[in-house]
Regions:
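Acidic/His- and Gly-rich active-site-bordering loop/insert found
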Residues: 1-85, 94, 101-111
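Divalent metal-coordination and catalytic microenvironments
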Residues: 11, 60, 89, 115, ...
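Histidine/acidic-residue-rich, glycine-tolerant segments that coordinate divalent metal ions
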Residues: 46, 67-69, 74-84, 90-91, ...
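A short beta-alpha structural unit
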Residues: 47, 213-220, 236-238, 264-283, ...
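Short amphipathic alpha-helices in soluble, non-transmembrane regions
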Residues: 130, 245-255
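A conserved active-site cap/scaffold subdomain adjacent to cofactor or substrate pockets
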Residues: 194, 223-245
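Zn-dependent metallopeptidase/amidohydrolase metal-coordination segment
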Residues: 293-350
Length: 352
């Protein structure tokens, strides 16, 4: 049996950003080449296909990429560069390799097994690149399974519901202004002033089902000049249809354009739907393993959602207990839960 804890820690040392997971891909390939599987490389990702001479495949998917975050943990397996596996993808890959090890030693299974190592989950394009490759159709995918580590849920337990993660829409706004010396700024278009009003008013659009917020705010380079632009980059997360909050945002932008006689561009085309699980798969999986029903939809986005639009899917959360939150530079967890996580998932890939 391979050591999934060691694998997780090895991968934690070498975090790489989306579509740049070259060393990560090599590490995984060097393990897979010793198994009785066909290895498909897709960009910086891989798919290990274990044939049991069946005409359909069950696919387990994990993600590979890290974040541009400087780790603050003082552990021997700390990141060796300026990136960090602050979202648990190192653990996801370790679990997937544990599954590879199991099915490599199995004589028969109701279906063929595909273990998918997907690049670039954190930035748009990872799951789309897999779907565009048609590899999932080529192996005749019947259904897909995946999971994500999740803080504040009971350590070692699996959780799911019908809509587990919200939709995610990128919001990119630019307010145009006039670049003049502040001594001559009276009656000029002040992009920073307008943008600040837009920021405050847009945050007020959030409610229990919809969230809008901005992580990037950019304006100006000179302290004594009006900025020619004010840029906001953020996201809308919605537990239901985001058209209502999107419509309110567009109305707010139109009002500010008319009031201040300026141009405000708003691009919201980058969109991931919510992660919707197949009800039949939920019910069947609960007959096999202990999965706790979640009472809420979380506002995280997850590009596994593109798979749920095409195939029956089951996506779960693996609780890691009282840890730092995801995407925090101090995120870490008790990785002794990983071997049992592998054992919990195995029956879901053996369903007839």
């Amino acid at each position: 049996m391979i050591d999934v804890i060691k694998i997780r820690r090895d991968l934690h040392k070498l975090p790489e950003l989306g579509f740049k997971e070259y060393n990560t891909q090599k590490y995984i390939f060097d393990i897979l080449k010793n198994f009785k599987c066909k290895i498909h490389k897709i960009n910086t990702g891989l798919l290990a296909h274990f044939s049991f001479n069946k005409n359909k495949s069950i696919v387990y998917r994990c993600d590979m990429d890290a974040l541009k975050i400087k780790e603050t943990n003082d552990v021997y397996y700390k990141s060796q560069n300026d990136n960090m596996h602050a979202c648990g993808h190192d653990a996801h890959m370790a679990i997937a390799l544990g599954l590879c090890d199991y099915f490599n030693n199995k004589k028969d299974n109701p279906y063929d097994i595909g273990i998918l190592f997907q690049p670039s989950e954190e930035s748009y394009g990872g799951s789309k690149s897999i779907l565009d490759s048609n590899i999932l159709d080529k192996i005749n995918t019947k259904y897909m399974v995946g999971l994500h580590l999740f803080p504040k849920l009971e350590k070692g337990k699996l959780f799911t519901n019908e809509i587990i993660f919200s939709s995610a829409r990128e919001v990119n706004i630019e307010v145009c202004g006039e670049e003049v010396h502040i001594a001559n700024s009276k009656n000029k278009v002040n992009a920073s002033l307008i943008g600040s009003k837009l920021l405050i008013k847009s945050l007020e659009l959030s409610n229990k089902n919809n969230l809008i917020n901005f992580g990037i705010i950019q304006s100006g380079n000179n302290r004594n000049s009006l900025s020619p632009s004010y840029i906001l980059k953020g996201t809308i997360r919605s537990k239901c249809d985001d058209k209502i909050i999107l419509n309110k945002l567009n109305k707010l932008i139109n009002r500010l354009q008319k009031k201040y006689h300026t141009k405000i561009s708003c691009d919201t085309s980058m969109f991931l739907p919510s992660v919707k699980n197949d009800l039949h798969l939920i019910n069947e999986s609960k007959k096999l393993i202990n999965i706790t029903h979640l009472k809420t939809t979380f506002l995280q986005g997850e590009d596994f959602s593109l798979y749920t639009n095409k195939y029956p899917c089951l996506f779960m959360l693996l609780g890691v207990g009282d840890t730092s939150l995801l995407h925090a530079p101090s995120f870490n967890f008790d990785d002794s839960i990983l071997p049992n996580a592998v054992n919990q998932i195995i029956p879901l890939l053996e369903m007839d």
